[in-house]
Amino acid sequence: MSLTTVKLLVLAPALALALAACNGDDVTGPTQAPENDDVAADVEAFCDDALGLGSPGEPEVDWETATEEEIAAAQQVFAEERLRPLVEDLRDSAPQDVQDDVATLEEALDEAEGSGDLEAFFGGAGGQARNAIAIEAADRCGWSSVDVTMVDYEFQGVPETLQAGPVVFSATNEGEESHEMIVFVKREGVEETWEEILGLEEAEVMERVEFVAATFAPAGEESTAAADLDPGEYVMVCFIPQGTDASGEEAGDGPPHFQEGMFADFTVE
């Protein structure tokens, strides 16, 4: 199997709301919600909108066969019809502390809608703005968190079981190579083991799983991913090829890391 990492990570920054504020034990439960009804309602709206930004879907395009022009056009539509409404919702619900960051995302979308390039939204100033919004969300929303260590070639600290609901995965890369964490859930009725599924061709794999979340961390760095998990059987996988440099900019020519054992399964109840 050789899933195209790039096409998954086009959306990873949106899925990887860098919730650096959620540190602590390997698994941390949700914090106390505000008691005041009005305050709770405001926080709930912000949390819903922040989580929506973390699960926006993807452009409608065949990544394998589309031309660069077709991909750009699809990303332009995605920016206009999907990302723009999400950011507009955040404009209404986000606290004052991150309103400047929402404005930065609006500017990034202006650029994306004009060019069909989502880099300004997913990276650079857009990425920093989303990080700030995510930190604010982590502080206010009380999502559970899971600390995961990535080494060459293993995920460490992954619990066997998690509770359903919003969860923040905080991934620290202590390896010599760059690593990613791509999270999938089995589709209903799938009975194969994760080892069997990951041994299939890409098209067959995607018939059996749904993409949930993704994040990437160069060697020595930390990144995070947030997702609203339903009950089911999950796995986190690293598809980066062996020999990729510490920054992730120069791809290696070896087998993907998961073939060296870098995948970990867990159950959500």
Set out the residue ranges of the language-model regions.
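Bacterial N-terminal signal peptides that target proteins for export
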Residues: 1-10
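Long, amphipathic, charge-rich alpha-helical segments that form helical bundles/coiled-coils
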Residues: 85-122, 235, 246
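Extracellular/periplasmic metallocenter environments
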Residues: 145-154, 162-164, 176, 213-269
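Long amphipathic alpha-helical scaffold segments
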Residues: 103-109, 116-149
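Asparagine-centered strand-capping/turn motif at beta-strand->loop junctions
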Residues: 171-175
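Short, low-complexity, disordered segments immediately C-terminal to signal peptides
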Residues: 23-44
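C-terminal motif of bacterial Sec signal peptides marking the signal peptidase cleavage site
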Residues: 18-21
